[in-house]
Amino acid sequence: PRLFALHHSATQYFSAAALPSPIPNPDIPDNQLFISNKWHDAVSKKTFPTVSPATGEVIGHVAEGDWADVDLAAKAARAAFRLGSPWRWMDALKRGWLLNHLADLVERDCVYLASLESLDNGKPFQESYVLDLDEVIKVYRYFAGWADKWHGKTIPMDGEHFCFTRHEPVGVCCQIIPWNFPLVMQSWKLALALAMGNTVVTKVAEQTPFSALYLASLIKEVGLPPGLVNIVTGYGPTAGAAIAHHMDIGKVAFTGSTKVGHLIQKAAGNSSLKRVTLELGGKSLSIVLADADMDHAVEQRQEALFFNMGQCCCPGSWTFIEESIYDEFLERTVEKAKQRRVGNPFDLDTQQGPQVDRERFERILGYIQLGQKEGAKLLCGGEHFRQQCFFIKPTVFGGVQDDMRIAREEIFGPVQPLFKFKKIEEVIERADNTRYGLAAAVFTQDLDKAMYFTQALQTGTVWVNTYNVVTCHTPLGGFKEPGNGRELGEDGLKAYTEVKTVTIKVPQKNS
């Protein structure tokens, strides 16, 4: 999700002159597994290539971890969590201090980290630097402040008893990180787990491993105890599946596809009934009423869909427009999409980079062809842009019907279908007729209508006259298939602790 209010786009928020120069060819960090504060080859000695989505060229090769490596990482994390270990003895205030120190080091190296993200992921450098790295720093600092403020309570009981609760860490927490926001999504999970006193095994996406591996070197520089954070690179069906099935792991947090989320939930149930937090995305929606500020709504919808090349968990891929303004909204949307600058991620004027890899690139082009076959009208874009790499021009479809596959299925790319509606009751019924429910937005100047939508829409988040405003302070999660649990905010911490009830018999109790 976009990490600040979209009434300013990134290019408006910071001019190119205000940005530091990116590093187009950053040095590649250690390409091994990080276990117990040491670098290791995979047990199998296998490696796999990482490809630049902007050029199609191999950036480097990374250790291919699998079950044996996950087992070593889990054992290291379990040892770091043992009773009496330095981590278990550490004051909560000190845990917070270490997280703040990690934020300091990320801030020190933010240009390099942003350059790694753009090289590995293909996103424009200005977004990696202005949005992603800024959010990463804020997340570590925010949850550093929670480390010594999450506590239990005393509970009045009948009889001669004194009762209190303790909030204890779950233990070994595993985190499966997606490729669309590698550092951001890692911080969303790692900061909370460490603030609450857990130890961690992280499996990073095979498409985007390098920023996480560099963060491992910063974790070591901070002085976190060995085994506290372990990072495994590898593929989902091997390393990811090993995490989901491992008996010594107490919690899994996963951000990714609905299909894989189902597999992880099933594996957790078939193994140790470990806790599972799933943020699975899907299709999110926006509803634009006739009284909305047209310029603002068009701008918000463009950024909500095309930001990060459409590779977001809640990209606003359904846009319902009231019939009386549909034609004008369509015209302005197409005009703005044609103006969007697609190109080299390291060009500071670039607004859209390539898709992350060939598989996703070809999948998106397949949906564009499918939309045309189903009868939707291609109004702009839909083309491969540049050879030997994975650019797709911003694409807008009109005349889309609710039963078309481009309407029902997650595309995860720069494809914007537009729908029209006549009545509020009608659009609410259509909007809720889906298995997804992560986020929604409504654009209107009528507060009564806005409040009605916030109550009626079956989504975990509803924005009014804005989109993708996600910060470390507020919880994020979905209804229905987008998953369970919440990330971020105070609510996000609940998944990382167990509540223990302690009851003591006392000889005399007085109020």
Swiss-Prot record:
Binding site for NAD(+): G256, S257, T258, K259, V260, G261
E.C. code: 1.2.1.3
Location(s), subcellular: Mitochondrion matrix
Site (Transition state stabilizer): N180
Extent of the transit peptide: 1-11
GO CC annotations on file: mitochondrial matrix
Cysteine disulfide partners in this protein: none
One Gene Ontology term of the molecular function aspect: aldehyde dehydrogenase (NAD+) activity
Alphabetic keyword roster: Acetylation, Mitochondrion, NAD, Oxidoreductase, Transit peptide
Record-listed N6-acetyllysine modification sites: K45, K46, K377, K393, K420, K423
Biological or metabolic pathway of the protein: Alcohol metabolism; ethanol degradation; acetate from ethanol: step 2/2
Positions where N6-succinyllysine occurs in the chain: K46, K75, K377, K393, K420
Reaction catalysis annotation: an aldehyde + NAD(+) + H2O = a carboxylate + NADH + 2 H(+)
Entry's Gene Ontology BP terms: ethanol catabolic process
Catalytic residues (positions): E279, C313
Annotated InterPro entries: Ald_DH/histidinol_DH, Ald_DH_C, Ald_DH_N, Aldehyde_DH_dom
Function: ALDHs play a major role in the detoxification of alcohol-derived acetaldehyde. They are involved in the metabolism of corticosteroids, biogenic amines, neurotransmitters, and lipid peroxidation. In the cornea, this enzyme may help in the absorption of the damaging UV-B, as well as in the detoxification of the UV-induced peroxidic aldehydes.
Family: Belongs to the aldehyde dehydrogenase family.
Subunit field text: Homotetramer.
Name assigned to this protein: Aldehyde dehydrogenase X, mitochondrial
Lineage: Eukaryota, Metazoa, Chordata, Craniata, Vertebrata
